[in-house]
Each structure stands twice: as structure tokens, then as C-alpha cells.
Amino acid sequence: MNAWEIWSYQPAGWPEPHPAVIVSAPNRVANKPDVNVLVCTSKTANRQALPFEVVLDEADGLDRQTLVKCDLFHLVKKDTLSNRRGDVSTERRRQIIATINRSNGWV
């Protein structure tokens, strides 16, 4: 398990798993039981991304377009992540970092 990988995540009460991007530092991912993730939509993206979202798709290893929500971090146990789905491409990593900063008012 590594930063920028996309895994399936299904919290209690959610009807289906969602793609989730690991955004914790590599040291945390390697050594701690909890990681930060950004959750994506579970359905195919059929609209433009909102200012706090980034589109992920086949270039990131997914089978369809999805929207990653960059304005809300989820702290999850690593053992609740299953089914590795892909890796965020280098360009999308830059987009996600910029969107996290912008949507949280950090820049």
C-alpha cells in the first residue's frame, strides 16, 4: 500500500464501495494503521468537475471516469481498504494537490 494508490473503501452504511485515493505521507502509509484518503464518486462522472473536484479515469487505472472530492479528508484504517484499483497519474497528482490547497483556502 502506497500514497497515491486508489483502493476501494466502503464505510458502514454506504451501499457500495467507492474509489479512495491515499494521500498520506509515505512514512505514515508504511508505518501506521490509519491513512488519509480522498473519496471519489462511485458512479461514472457525467458532469464537469466542481471547483473542489478532480476527474480521474483510465489514465489512473480506473475503468471509468470518477470525481475525487478534494475538500474532505477521511481518516481510515488501512485494513478497511480493499481491491487496489489503480495509481493516480503524475499530472493528476499535481491537480489534486492544487485543488486540495485551493478548496481548503490554503493558497
Name these PLM-found stretches.
Residues 58-107:
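C-terminal terminal-subdomain/extension
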Residues 15-56:
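Compact nucleic-acid interaction/catalytic patches
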